[in-house]
Amino acid sequence: MNLISENQKYKTLLLNNFIRYVKIWSESSGEQAEKGVFPSTPQQWDMANTLKDELTALGMQNVTVTDKCYVYANYPASDDMQNSDSVLFLAHMDTVDEVSGKNVNPQIINDGTNFTKDKTDTIITTDKKTLLGGDDKAGIAAIMTALAYITSEKCSHSAVEVIFSPDEETGHGMDFVPTELIKSKYAYTVDGGDLGEMETECFNAWSATVNFTGKACHTGYAKKGGMINANLMLASFLSKLPVNKMPQTTEGFEGFIAPMESSATIESATLNLLLRSFSNTEIDEEKNIIMKLADKVKDETGGLVTVTFKQQYLNMKEKLDENPRVVERVVKAFKEANVNVVNSPIRGGTDGSRLTEMGIPTPNIFTGSYEFHSRNEWCSLNQMAKASDIILNILFDK
């Protein structure tokens, strides 16, 4: 069924929801998140409180914003579907801090030919001064529009729960998720991109922090004083990273090592890296590369090099394979919406990968958003509406 994409009333509601959400500044901060601040920015509360008010107005039940800025609500099954499985849908409220998400000025293009080759499509894009925020406000809009349908139209549907989370972009989106409120045995994140994407496999993700300790002395007497410059230790380490393991040289199922940020003085330097792979074996190989390079720089310079690894999230494929119902239900929903399934690996992670680790299998579905995290970001209204159709089809499945 295509109850949103073929209904002008609800497509207009979807567009209005999306435009309203992207105008709300809700950028997170990776720097603050790494310091333990949660949520990492105060503006995420503005988005949370807006959604709380809107969920309440829809007639959703048990609407709450937790003390950690998670928005939760549920809605009971219709009388004829009391025995159906409850389903949880999730989307994240924050936008990435790499490109500004403040004062977003969305541009509406009523001819999608140059974007989706569909003249009837409506495209929402940016004025090139900020990102758009389709990641993941397109997901929020798709969920909210589907909820508007089931709370106002007479229809048979299963019980539904929703969670809108903070700090997904910082990698901390599930750190304080209120699992005690969740009744559903499985869930879906609405945080994908291209039309038809259904993602059941993601990276194993680790971070590495490399600390370099040198020896400072007066620069005029550095030779006599035995200066060991941590700036040069850092540079030497970076120069030794294998080019064929960089993000810009990998694709598909290939993993990578990504240097993300660094700081340095003569006496000390710090480098943060991301390690990504679909297999634990390759992750171990990447860790080994880092350790060998650390030892090499230490031996060459006489300074001290230490490495700390931290697990961020794991590939969700194994857990989803153990729970076929969650995938079967969404595949059926795609077919009913006349959308071809494109089951591709996520070269990243979602809140769903963390939730899957916690025992709630959670694949990811598309939103119709493109060119994330950039000033060229854009969304297709027709595809966003299809995502909303699929949410409803999941809820209608007995």
Please provide the spans of the model-predicted regions:
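Phosphate/diphosphate-binding glycine-rich loops and adjacent basic-rich segments that engage nucleotide
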Residues: 187-232
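A non-catalytic alpha/beta surface segment that caps or lines the substrate-entry region
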Residues: 32-84
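A short glycine/serine-rich beta->alpha loop
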Residues: 125-134, 171, 217-223, 374, ...
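N-terminal capping segment at the start of a domain
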Residues: 3-5, 11-41, 125, 313, ...
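Active-site metal-coordination/substrate-binding segment of hydrolases
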Residues: 13, 81-159, 164, 184, ...
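Acidic/histidine-rich catalytic neighborhood of metal-dependent amide-processing enzymes
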Residues: 124-205, 246-260, 264, 271-278, ...
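Glycine/charged-rich beta-loop-alpha catalytic/anionic-binding loops adjacent to active sites
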Residues: 116-130, 213-217, 337, 369-373
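Metal-dependent amide/peptide-bond hydrolase catalytic core
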Residues: 2, 230-398
